[in-house]
Amino acid sequence: RDCLLSRGLGDVYKRQSPNPVDIVEVDAIRTLTDAGHIVIACGGGGIPVLQQNNHLKGASGVIEKDLTAGKLAEQIDADELIILTSVEKVCLNHGKEDEEELDTISVEQAKQYMDEGHFGIYNMLPKFQASVGFIEKKEGRSALITSFDTLKDALKGKTGTVIE
């Protein structure tokens, strides 16, 4: 079977995750969030499906999880996208002598950093793509990237990377 592979770390290749086009259950998710419920949805990006006539058919693969989070936030008209990861703040030149933590940056700066290749395709790049895509769809939106352990402080503006 033909599939598109991309190079991961070292000599490892992995099947590329498709980008989300739509969230099938967005109406149910929106109803629950509007009623004040905390909804956990689209875990791991979700299972891709194809619509054939009036039926959904599962497709091989796993949807890109960060882009799915951005798509869901967009479709429920959220004001802020929060992406949790393994680091407290995003860094340029991660792990190098000239490492630089990012606090608050603009969408334009985020795009520049992506264009300059600062972020890996399997770690920070999809988080930035999701954040920028979400913010650009509607004025006044922002995105926060931080770790689960620092989320409370990040929500108070004490840490994390904010994209505006």
Feature map (PLM): residue ranges:
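Single conserved hydrophobic/aromatic residue that forms the stacking wall/gate
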Residues: 2-13
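Active-site phosphate/oxyanion-binding loops
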Residues: 15-28, 33-145, 149-164
